[in-house]
Amino acid sequence: MSQETVLASIEEAIDKSLKLGRGKRFKQSVEIIVALKDIDLKSPQARIRETVFLPNRPPKEAKVCVVAHGDMELQAKEAGVEVLNRQDLQNLSQNKREVKKLARRCYWVLVRADLMGLAGRILGPALGPRGKAPVPVPPNANIKDLIERYKAAVWVRIRNQPQVMARIGTEDMSPRELAENALAVLQVIENRLGRGKISRIYVKKTMGPPVEVPAIG
């Protein structure tokens, strides 16, 4: 089946899901749910956690936070994101409540590589249960470019159920844009597990019913 045919099938389901349900007072996200089969959740190979860079950035961007020092800290502040330095991390180590708040509000935590040990020890216990993890950044990386890329990125992960759920955009995006984002998620799953591991695919709005994507295998 050609990629264009797959896109058309996904787009058809998304278009239907966007029309279902009453309008809400808030902008709803659009999600993809991928049900998997023949997956051993006890196997390390099945416990995937991958980054997907969506080709079409949602208007509701993922919140990016940066842990850095020196020039990278300054560049991140210029980019307008929340920034923590070494001293900020050390202060947080005494305040688990604030660490949990940070873990809730930051979808991505980009960490300068030489601060990964400290960030992992302090932030890891709060990020892990939320399916998140600090992302190491080389000291010479262009942090502004990375921030922009991660604003359009989502985690793809398998935890305690044989399925993947990911936000692919918002209801004000076009069905084709959302379909292209959904395809990016599917390609990452297939690259890791193989297409034969995908059982069913659904799309839905936050408060809407799931709509199954026609078979694309």
From Swiss-Prot:
Keywords: Repressor, Ribonucleoprotein, Ribosomal protein, RNA-binding, rRNA-binding, Translation regulation, tRNA-binding. The keyword Repressor applies. One of its GO terms (molecular function) is rRNA binding. GO terms for cellular component: large ribosomal subunit. InterPro entries: Ribosomal_uL1, Ribosomal_uL1-like, Ribosomal_uL1/biogenesis, Ribosomal_uL1_3-a/b-sand, Ribosomal_uL1_arc. One of its GO terms (biological process) is translation. The keyword Glycosyltransferase does not apply. Binds directly to 23S rRNA. Probably involved in E site tRNA release. Protein L1 is also a translational repressor protein, it controls the translation of its operon by binding to its mRNA. HAMAP family: Ribosomal_uL1_A. Part of the 50S ribosomal subunit. Belongs to the universal ribosomal protein uL1 family. This is Large ribosomal subunit protein uL1. It comes from Aeropyrum pernix (strain ATCC 700893 / DSM 11879 / JCM 9820 / NBRC 100138 / K1). The gene is rpl1.
